[in-house]
């Protein structure tokens, strides 16, 4: 893949991505971890991954709009290592031109996690994006700006968090 900022851009799974999703579904089923429901981002790359997991596990799956990736505005589709973007992403409170700020993203995800935390009788599998994973990690762990910037997960990585 091209190492460009996808954000809200429609970017379907590649064949490799579909294979990873099928393998993840098998791994989730084999893990023995109790899961009640899959919640997934409305973006097709996450939705297709969630459907592959649901097919392998038999778990119900529901679209959760708050799990959509951050909107990077004018930076959508540009190289991740672009100088202007690298500087902009260090300004957490500033909204990307035509997009949303890191603070807005964090509020959206923290509100969702607070709701899931209050639903104590259920366990959820979230299928989303690396930017969302970073915010989820910051919900559970204290992080410096540097640790936050370096945080994330691999494609189709299965990570468990407990409230």
Residue spans for each PLM region:
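Short beta-strand scaffold positions
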Residues: 40-41, 107, 127-128
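Active-site-adjacent alpha-helix immediately C-terminal to a catalytic or transition-state-stabilizing loop
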Residues: 47, 55, 110-163
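Active-site-proximal alpha-helix that buttresses catalytic centers in soluble enzyme cores
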Residues: 1-59, 100
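Short aromatic-enriched loop/helix-cap "lid" or pocket-rim segments at secondary-structure transitions
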Residues: 1-4, 50, 73-77, 139
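Catalytic metal-binding/acid-base residues of hydrolase active sites
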Residues: 44, 67, 131
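Generic hydrophobic alpha-helical segments
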Residues: 24, 28, 105-116
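Phosphate-handling substructures
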Residues: 11, 54-110
């Amino acid at each position: 893949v091209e190492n460009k900022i996808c954000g809200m851009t429609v970017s379907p799974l590649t064949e490799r991505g579909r294979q990873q999703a099928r393998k993840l579904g098998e791994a989730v089923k084999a893990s023995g971890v109790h899961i009640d429901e899959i919640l997934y981002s409305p973006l097709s790359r996450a939705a297709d991954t969630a459907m592959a997991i649901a097919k392998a596990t038999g778990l119900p799956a529901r679209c959760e709009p708050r799990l959509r990736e951050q909107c990077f505005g004018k930076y959508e589709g540009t190289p991740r290592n672009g100088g202007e973007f690298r500087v902009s992403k260090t300004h957490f409170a500033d909204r990307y031109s035509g997009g949303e700020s890191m603070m807005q993203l964090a509020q959206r995800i923290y509100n969702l996690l607070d709701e899931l935390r209050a639903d104590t009788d259920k366990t959820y599998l979230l299928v989303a994006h690396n930017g969302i994973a970073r915010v989820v990690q910051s919900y559970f762990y204290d992080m410096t700006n540097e640790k936050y910037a370096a945080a994330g997960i691999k494609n189709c990585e299965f990570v468990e968090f407990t409230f």
